[in-house]
Amino acid sequence: MFLEKINQKTGEREWVVAEEDYDMAQELARSRFGDMILDFDRNDKFLAGLKTTIAEKKHENTDGKVHVLDIGTGTGLLSLMAAREGADKVTALEVFKPMGDCARHITSNSPWSDKITVISERSTDVSQIGGSRADIIVAEVFDTELIGEGALRTFKEALERLAKPGCRVVPSTGNVYIVPVESHLLKMFNDIPRLNGEKDEEPLGRCSGTAAVFDVQLSEMKTHEFRELSEPIVAFKFDFEHEEKIIFDESFVREAVAHSSGTIDALLMWWDIDMDRNGTTFIDMGPKWKNKNNYAWRDHWMQAVYYLPEKKKVEMNQTFEIVCNHDEFSLWFSNVGKDKSRSYCVCGLHSMLSRQTVYHVNEMFENQKFKDEVDKLSKGLHVATVGEGSFLGLLAAKTAKRVTIIDGNERFRDIFFKYIHYYKLTNVEIIEKVTSLTDSPDIVLAEPFYMSAMNPWNHLRFLYDVEVLKMMHGDELRVEPHMGVLKAIPEKFEDLQNIASDVGTVNGFDLSFFDEISTKARTATDAIVDEQSLWEYAGIVKGDAVEILRFPIDGRVSSQKCVVNIDNMSSSNAIPMWMEWEFGGINLSTGLLSISSAGVPEWNKGYKQGVYFPITALRNDKSLCLHALFDKSTGDINFQFGKSEDS
């Protein structure tokens, strides 16, 4: 079996051969299904929908028998619900084999084992289900965009091939809502970075960006960070119960009235689903500030942000229109009178960078403290900058005598050439490799930033570039940052820990076998450290930041290890980790920026942070012992957590 892995020394993607006994359960553990299973609002609403429709069908069918088809059964939870609510036969489909095996074990050890059959196939590949068609289809095949996991085809083909006439579907219908907003914050995740911050700058020409969804926990956006310009607009209405009404490609012009003047910088999106068509049982994805009475946190579905191809100004009380489009798998929105087809990036920036990285570059261009330090370090000097996709060299050009940008990514070099031409930066050159820098620079600068990095410490690739440069140009070559520090802090999240929590008994069903295989997989490997945008998740820090490893940027890369205790864990449920860099006279943090008097952390929105969730055996300890090993040969950091002697 082959697995893709990123070489942390070079940034290259490599294929490695897994051991013959590689356990796919490890993939199951890393997939973090726990949050979905522990979504009690979801579970209760599906249960209510099943209860209603099973009762209706039992009354309606002459023999009083009901066959339920569960598509994408996961642990088998919805199948168990259907059987307990009186379904006479349940056929459960699950294409992901480790999950299907898990469901088969759980259902076969339940009181309803004689009613439930688990089939490890995709619903669109199945031609018959146990000799009789379904009276009810239940499926949780949704994502942030509602239809992104193929819900439309799943329901349409199942109704056509696997269901009886009049088959009920749980859920029955769905609505998608959009709200146009003005927001400087959300602009930063999409706007092409402008070196001087002027609105009329177009260093990469005009580009509408990409129509791709930007999924985000909108509940953690502060209300002062955006301004709603109208009431929510119903963009789409989906009927999942009637195959003839399920259409893959549609376009609608929706009207709204502006309740204040402003510019539509972004569209906020969420959806709801009616579980039984009775209009009383909904799963509502509205964010917390819009849905105070019915809000339920979840991470397996989120809200989303979309951007119009062109920003649109509206005046108070003006009626305006937005074109709402969808195909089989995705949604997009466009301006009236313009091409309604999906917009694509033509500048190269949006197609290469994540929304988070676009924000990072825009934030860097706005960070006056950082720009002042770059100006001071660069003044009158030959500056070399290293990284992959780092815009630092463009900032250094303001005061430097000469700037050499070293970037191995050809597409980024093309983008930088466009910036150089647009801003007439005659003192900037670009080369591909650190070994091509033949003239000794006065100083080497880096953020450090490498686009291929998955977490903050993957930017330690910078150490290897500096090692080569110092071998070529001497140990006296000045480098900033001159120190990197890996840090950690205990935190109690309100909800994020659910993605790694044990599920145990859910709605009266024993799902502990899922915990057994997940825990076994997690403990058999290095500690699983997730990458998360922590600004999207509410929590309170419960102690001081702890230094784990220090990395002097002196040109000598060496393996190192440490053992450190993380205290106050009995009141915490996670350990966030991040890198800080000592850059000249300032500190650059990829993670924690500040802590309020109430203990609320502010996290850097331009990076993902690492976060470790203690396994069950460690969750009640007052202190955890962290063993961290930086391996020079691979550029990786391996983490192991265990009981502290102080616990």
Curated annotation (Swiss-Prot):
The active site is at E140, E149. It comes from the Eukaryota. Keywords: Methyltransferase, Repeat, S-adenosyl-L-methionine, Transferase. Belongs to the class I-like SAM-binding methyltransferase superfamily. Protein arginine N-methyltransferase family. PRMT7 subfamily. This is Protein arginine N-methyltransferase 7. Residues 12-332, 337-647 form the SAM-dependent MTase PRMT-type domain. The keyword Repeat applies. Transmembrane segments: none annotated. Its EC number is 2.1.1.-. It comes from Caenorhabditis elegans. SUPFAM superfamilies: S-adenosyl-L-methionine-dependent methyltransferases (SSF53335). Arginine methyltransferase that can both catalyze the formation of omega-N monomethylarginine (MMA) and symmetrical dimethylarginine (sDMA). GO terms for molecular function: histone methyltransferase activity; protein-arginine N-methyltransferase activity. GO terms for biological process: chromatin remodeling; methylation; regulation of DNA-templated transcription.
